[in-house]
A protein has these predicted regions:
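Membrane-embedded alpha-helical bundles of multi-pass transporters/translocases
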Residues: 2-457
């Protein structure tokens, strides 16, 4: 172990207050409420409200995805270089919520200008909003190992965060379109901008509430430390096998999750002729909240690695059960719920465990590059995996002869089954393989924490 830790933490093994836990969870309520509103309805707004062509709207969203894949590690480097009296991550919850709220709301305003001007405006406003969201989401993940060194407390905090995220999505799904109709009074353009402003105000307020109440450890020392050079940030990845294995597993998982969630509407519409079930199916996914809350209790008898692997295997099994359900709707709904319970657990675990990869890097190399390690392990995996998952789904269906807005051939229906069931199920199972090699590193967690506390004392 290196005798010099260039970015140190003091002992932080005590449990945090209920207020800090609630505040940490509120960050994901804030982020998901506003960002998911944009990601869910922006395409419809562009094409059916602003009048932008589908092809141009697709290019805008594709460019945003490309930028998303680039800006996550950049934000990680920025966080590693941040030095303030509030710490490394916490100040961003003061500096960014208002700009993020403003540009997210502006994304749902279409100025009365030429169509080319509208497209340029849409691209700029949406991309800036996406960049600012990454700027908030990256420190949200990176602050966890800076709040506490306790693996147990990190797991509890992460459960609060993931529950908050699900609440944010649930609130958005339940209120977005009713608010558009009510606030717009028949004018969709007015309805969307007023709804976006409403969500933006709530999001900004919740983020500032979290900023007020959460704390990083040892901010006085961090404030006066030299900034971590970019070269050393990347050096923290070298030989950090826990981090490498988690990044690989998490990236594969997000490809699978996005592919499954993107194609459920196609499966219900074309294979079962039950498009009316889409709202019900989407709302039932929130049942996973109950199991996310229970993760700290599972951890009392199971290693975190096995909880993550178990979630992936349950998600795989749920996919197989959906295939067996065929046109039995009750069986299908039960299998969908089961699959979402598994994916909900698997989605939660990386956020709780990436802090250990940061600790491992500090223990092994003497470099604690919290920002870039967690940016790659969380935000990059989510955004890149989601983009690849959507692309893979489209490629699979297209290769089987899928034709939009038409009755599908037998081959087209088979392609939807592969895109919705078999490819995600195989990828969920594949994501578990790197974790089989991770367990031996998790067994070192207490020793590493003790060594870091000794060095920093």
């Amino acid at each position: 172990m290196s005798s010099v830790i260039e970015d140190t933490q003091p002992s932080g093994s005590a449990s945090l207050s209920l207020l800090q836990r609630i505040s940490y969870g509120s960050l994901d309520v804030a982020g998901n409420l506003l960002y998911c509103f944009g990601s869910t309805y922006i395409l419809y707004f562009y094409t059916d409200v602003a009048g932008i062509s589908l092809a141009v709207a697709g290019v805008i969203l594709l460019l945003a995805r490309i930028i998303d894949g680039i800006d996550a590690p950049i934000w990680g480097i920025i966080i590693d270089k941040t030095r303030s009296r509030y710490g490394k991550c916490r100040p961003w919850f003061l500096w960014l919520p208002l700009p993020f709220a403003v540009f997210s709301a502006l994304s749902f305003w279409s100025p009365d200008i030429s169509m080319t001007g509208k497209a340029i405006y849409a691209a700029i406003s949406y991309m800036i909003a996406s960049i600012l969201f990454t700027g908030l989401n990256t420190p949200l993940s990176a602050i966890l190992p800076l709040m506490t060194l306790s693996p147990k407390e990190r797991l509890v905090l992460n459960s609060w965060r993931m529950t908050g995220g699900q609440i944010g999505v649930l609130l958005m799904n339940a209120t977005a379109l009713p608010l558009v109709a009510f606030l717009g009074n028949g004018d969709d353009h007015a309805g969307f901008i007023y709804t976006a402003i409403t969500f933006a105000i709530i999001s900004c307020a919740l983020t500032l509430f979290a900023f007020k109440n959460i704390r990083e450890m040892d901010t006085d020392k961090i404030q006066h430390e030299p900034k971590l050079p970019m070269k050393k940030s990347f050096a923290a990845m070298k030989g950090n096998w826990p981090w490498i294995l988690m990044v690989l597993a998490n990236l594969i998982f997000w490809i699978a999750l996005q592919q499954r969630n993107t194609t459920i509407v196609y499966y219900l519409t074309y294979n079962l002729d039950r498009k009316d079930l889409v709202p019900l199916i989407n709302s039932l996914a929130t049942i996973q909240i109950l199991f996310i809350i229970a993760i700290p209790f599972f951890s009392k008898s199971l290693a975190k690695t096995w909880i993550w692997v178990g979630g992936l295997l349950v998600a795989t099994f749920g996919g197989v059960m959906m295939w067996l359900a065929a046109d039995n709707i009750t069986f299908l709904i039960a299998a969908w719920i089961l699959g979402n319970i598994g994916s909900g657990i698997a989605c939660s675990m990386p956020f709780a465990m990436l802090g250990f990869a940061v600790d491992f890097g500090a223990w092994k190399t003497g470099i604690k590059a919290t920002g870039i390690l967690i940016a790659f392990g969380s935000t990059f995996c989510i955004k890149m995996g989601s983009g690849l998952g959507t692309a893979f789904a489209a490629w699979i269906m297209n290769s089987f002869g899928y034709v939009p807005n038409h009755a599908q051939s037998a081959a087209g229906l088979e392609g939807i089954i592969w895109a919705f069931i078999w490819a995600p199920a195989l990828l969920f199972a594949l994501a578990a393989i790197p974790l089989l090699f991770f367990r031996k590193y998790e067994a070192m967690e207490e020793k590493i924490r003790h060594d870091l506390e000794t060095v920093n004392s």
